[in-house]
Regions:
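Active-site-proximal region of nucleotide-activated glycan assembly enzymes
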Residues: 37-115, 120
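Glycine/threonine-rich flexible loop motifs
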Residues: 31-38, 154-157, 230
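An anion/phosphate-binding loop that grips the pyrophosphate of nucleotide cofactors and donors
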Residues: 18, 85, 216
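Structural alpha-helical scaffold elements that stabilize or flank donor/cofactor-binding regions
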Residues: 14-16, 77-81, 211-212
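Conserved nucleotide-sugar donor-binding subdomain of glycosyltransferases
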Residues: 1-36, 65-66
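Donor-nucleotide binding loops and adjacent catalytic segments primarily
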Residues: 93, 103, 118-218, 250, ...
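A donor-sugar binding/catalytic signature common to diverse glycosyltransferases
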Residues: 207-251
Length: 270
């Protein structure tokens, strides 16, 4: 409770000091409910003119996570949006997916909803060449990058990639770089490392993942938002395995596959 009080006071004090023109809130009230204790007091103070007037904008991704009490949750979201917010920015392309497709109460939102397109970093020029030189991989050789996001549920696809790589007849020309994610179980990590053969490097994490995709001839990954945006940004040919229990990954990957941006792997493909 003390930490919450301090956070709430810090945010409120910041607003009093800076008097911003725009208050951009990520996901809330669609999600991040755990932070309402510090966000709501600011929203109320702006609404009641106890803080300087500013535009309050909600920033939200393309696909919303399903809620158990969906109808009640969406009603609360709409009430908060219409009362405190001036607009919603959806980081998506409406040709691919619209907010209304994962938010049933969309038509009850009375404030403007605008689509920004997907937000993704672009790799620096020649970054792919830099990575290939760093890995000592020639222009005629093939680099495959396999990844599993945070790693919590990524063992099956990484194990499958290693098995498939071991069967390639052109291994001398093909290189595999595996990023397991920091949260992959240690036993799974040790097993992957032990099974890695020639031209295979297994590591948990890189701060330069976008550059590796820019250098790659093929990406094999799960279908999380950030990885998918990296795939689109670099244009690397991609095989994507959406996590079976995640509607968001399945829906996004399926729509992108229909547009030819990637190919979807099913469980049986593993």
């Amino acid at each position: 409770d003390q930490i919450k009080e301090q956070r709430q006071q810090a945010l409120f004090t910041l607003f009093e000091k800076e008097t911003p023109d725009i208050f951009l809130v990520e996901l809330y009230p669609f999600g991040r409910k755990a932070f309402r204790f510090e966000i709501d007091p600011v929203l109320e103070a702006i609404s009641e003119k106890r803080l300087a007037s500013c535009k309050v904008i909600c920033s939200v991704r393309d696909i919303l996570v399903e809620k158990e009490d969906r109808d009640k949750h969406e009603s609360r979201v709409v009430e908060t949006l219409n009362r405190y917010f001036d607009a919603v920015l959806v980081h998506a392309d409406p040709k691919l997916i619209e907010l209304r497709q994962t938010f049933d109460h969309f038509d009850e939102i009375s404030i403007p909803v605008s689509y920004t397109g997907y937000i993704a970093a672009k790799p620096a020029p020649d970054t792919g060449i830099r990575i290939r030189k760093q890995l000592e991989i020639g222009e005629e050789e093939i680099l495959v990058v396999a990844s599993a996001g945070g790693g919590n549920v990524g063992a099956p696809i990484l194990e499958s990639v290693l098995r498939a790589f071991g069967r390639l007849g052109m291994k001398s020309r093909c290189h595999l770089k595996v990023f397991t994610g920091p949260f992959l179980d240690q036993n799974d990590f040790d097993r992957l490392t032990k099974s890695a053969g020639n031209n295979v490097q297994v590591t948990r994490f890189t701060t330069d993942f976008l550059s590796y995709l820019a250098a790659a001839d093929l990406s094999v990954s799960m279908g999380g938002y950030n990885t998918t945006m990296n795939i689109l940004s670099t244009g690397v040919p991609a095989l994507v395995w959406p996590f079976p229990q995640n509607r968001e990954q399945r829906l996004r990957a399926g729509r992108l596959a229909d547009m030819g941006a990637l190919r979807v792997l099913e469980d049986e493909d593993l």
